[in-house]
């Protein structure tokens, strides 16, 4: 079914229509060092207990707890040191009555011992030491399997592999990892007014900023990107390049050509490639004419030619589609609360997304609009790390109001907590 009329739908419904499509990428196996930012295709289980053995979390002395009973400031108890081991070494001594093994962090607890005394809790002599407090069984010991046991699920299918997950995979010996193949993306900027970055400016022309921006956004997600030659406002060539892109890529992103002008051909292109239009208008600003279609398991995104609207469309709609195709556990944008630090008095007949700068503090998040915020603005994008989401039907917001924000970058510094 092709949607002919432009009936605006809510942002959340638009995202839901995208993720309702049956589109998934195949599982592949990659080397551990190539797995960053991929999504796991299966659960990862612990291949052994961690710790693998009872070990010391401190530098100190391994003793029998029973020998420490009765120790006090007035009754210091003495121990004789019979061995010295570091991490990776195992003592062959059996700890006996009032004996101890000098032990370093990470070393295996020797036979006979069941507690560790930290160095700072002792008074050391040449080959003996004394303590002034009793220790209980297993005190200051990391017990075998207390973190994970063999067979425990340590990473879930659908989880994004971040540096911490890399550490887990390496710990359990996963030199290769089964992940979901990431989709490839075609980026096609359209408009007879567009010049390439190296071109000399001409009257009535602007440089193509959307193409490089979308490429960067996609590559930031770890996606393979194909850049196509900037397309003039011509229907036949537009159909041809979109067909070519669909043959080679899983996602096709066009910028421009989605409005209602005389040279906006995207609706006709979607008809020509037999794509089902999921929606062609969203109740939001900027980017209300964002159009998304689906054909043969592939997404076609028609993003606005206005830079801020184009950026907003990628964050709200392309990102969830990529996550959905890769089987991610969470696909919807994450929303957090923040305190607005400046007035924003513009009325919002539809949900409005404002480029802004968020700061996470010990008292919570604060946010300030990032300069000029019209849909065609470019500079505000560079200085933003989030989008403020103002609900439709609101008549502006004052400083001090709580608003919803979507983080788009990870540099929302906790000012009071900076080193």
From Swiss-Prot:
Pathway: Cofactor biosynthesis; molybdopterin biosynthesis. Gene3D superfamilies: MoaB/Mog-like domain, MoeA, C-terminal, domain IV, Molybdopterin biosynthesis moea protein, domain 2, Molybdopterin biosynthesis moea protein, domain 3. Its cofactor is Mg(2+). It catalyses: adenylyl-molybdopterin + molybdate = Mo-molybdopterin + AMP + H(+). Its EC number is 2.10.1.1. It holds the Pfam family MoCF_biosynth. One of its GO terms (cellular component) is cytosol. It comes from the Bacteria. SMART domains: MoCF_biosynth (SM00852). Catalyzes the insertion of molybdate into adenylated molybdopterin with the concomitant release of AMP. Belongs to the MoeA family. This is Molybdopterin molybdenumtransferase. It comes from Staphylococcus aureus (strain Mu50 / ATCC 700699). The gene is moeA.
């Amino acid at each position: 079914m092709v949607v002919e009329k432009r009936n605006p739908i809510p942002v959340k419904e638009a995202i839901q229509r995208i993720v309702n499509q049956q589109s998934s990428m195949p599982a592949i196996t990659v080397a551990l060092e190539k797995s960053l930012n991929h999504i796991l295709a299966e659960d990862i289980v612990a291949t052994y207990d961690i710790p693998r053995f009872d070990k010391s979390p401190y530098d100190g002395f391994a003793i029998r707890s029973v020998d420490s009973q009765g120790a006090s400031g007035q009754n210091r108890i003495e121990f004789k040191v019979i061995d010295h081991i570091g991490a990776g070494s195992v003592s062959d001594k059996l700890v006996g009555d009032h004996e101890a093994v000098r032990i370093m962090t990470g070393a295996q607890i020797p036979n006979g011992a069941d507690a560790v005394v930290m160095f700072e809790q002792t008074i050391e002599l040449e080959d003996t030491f004394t303590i002034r407090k009793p220790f209980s069984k297993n005190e200051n010991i990391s017990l075998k399997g207390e973190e994970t046991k063999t067979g425990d699920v340590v990473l879930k299918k659908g989880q994004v592999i971040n540096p911490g997950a890399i550490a887990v995979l390496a710990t359990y010996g996963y030199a290769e990892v089964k992940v979901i193949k990431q989709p490839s993306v075609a980026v096609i900027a359209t408009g007879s007014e567009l010049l390439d970055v190296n071109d000399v400016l001409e009257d009535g022309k602007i440089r193509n900023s959307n193409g490089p921006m979308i490429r960067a956004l996609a590559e930031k997600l770890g996606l393979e990107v194909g850049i196509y030659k900037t397309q003039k406002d011509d229907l036949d060539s537009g159909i041809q390049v979109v067909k070519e892109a669909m043959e080679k890529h899983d996602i096709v992103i066009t910028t421009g050509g989605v409005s209602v002008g005389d040279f906006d051909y995207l609706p006709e292109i979607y008809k020509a490639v037999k794509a089902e239009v999921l929606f062609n208008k969203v109740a939001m600003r900027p980017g209300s004419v964002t159009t998304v279609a689906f054909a043969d398991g592939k997404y076609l995104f028609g993003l606005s030619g206005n830079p801020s609207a184009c950026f907003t469309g990628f964050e709200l709609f392309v990102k969830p589609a990529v996550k959905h195709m890769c089987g991610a556990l969470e696909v919807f944008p994450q929303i957090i609360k923040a305190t607005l630090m400046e007035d924003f008095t513009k009325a919002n007949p539809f949900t409005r997304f404002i480029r802004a700068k968020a700061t996470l503090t010990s008292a919570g998040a604060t946010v300030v609009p990032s300069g000029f915020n019209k849909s065609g603005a470019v500079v505000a994008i560079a200085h933003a790390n989030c989008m403020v989401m103002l609900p439709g039907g609101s008549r502006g917001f004052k400083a001090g109001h709580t608003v919803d924000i979507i983080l788009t970058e990870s540099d929302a510094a906790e000012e009071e907590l900076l080193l």
